[in-house]
Amino acid sequence: TFAAEYKGRKADVVVCNPPYIKQGCGEAQEKESLRLCRHEGAVTLDEICRAAGRLLKSGGRFYMVHKAPRCADVFECMTRHSITPKEITTVCAREGDAPYLVIVCGRKDGGEGLLWHKPIVVYDKDGNFTPTIKQLYGEKDV
């Protein structure tokens, strides 16, 4: 319905932090607000990518944060709706850990090429936020 409001107009940028868990997978949340924000159901990954594909002008950017294990699903859905994954940033809890999140930037009608950015590490060895995270959150003691 939101995309319908923009019928005929095109966006330069679309940003989304969608529900991460496929419908029917994972432990169901009892609280409706948690279920809606964590589990597909009210909206699916494909519906989000389809709406972004319709909203974006050619060359427009689509930014999405998602769970790292669903990276292939994200790439496939984006590509199906004419959005080419162009940039990836992984997010790791600590240095040396496997990524748990990916930040994907896609371009409508984007062509070839994929750029991998340096991973974002959330915590240092003492469990404190890294300077990168402090900077992203706007803390002044960095």
Predicted regions and their residues:
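Phosphate/oxyanion-binding loops and surfaces in catalytic or ligand/nucleic-acid-binding neighborhoods
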Residues: 21, 81, 109
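Conserved Class I SAM-dependent methyltransferase catalytic core
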Residues: 41-99, 103-104
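Residues in well-ordered beta-strands of folded domains
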Residues: 12, 89, 123
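SAM/dcSAM-binding transferase cores
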Residues: 96-142
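Mobile active-site "lid"/loop adjacent to the S-adenosyl-L-methionine
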Residues: 9, 13, 18-47
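Conserved SAM/SAH-binding loop
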Residues: 1-4
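Short acidic/glycine-rich loop or secondary-structure boundary segments that cap or lie
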Residues: 6, 22-28, 60, 72-74
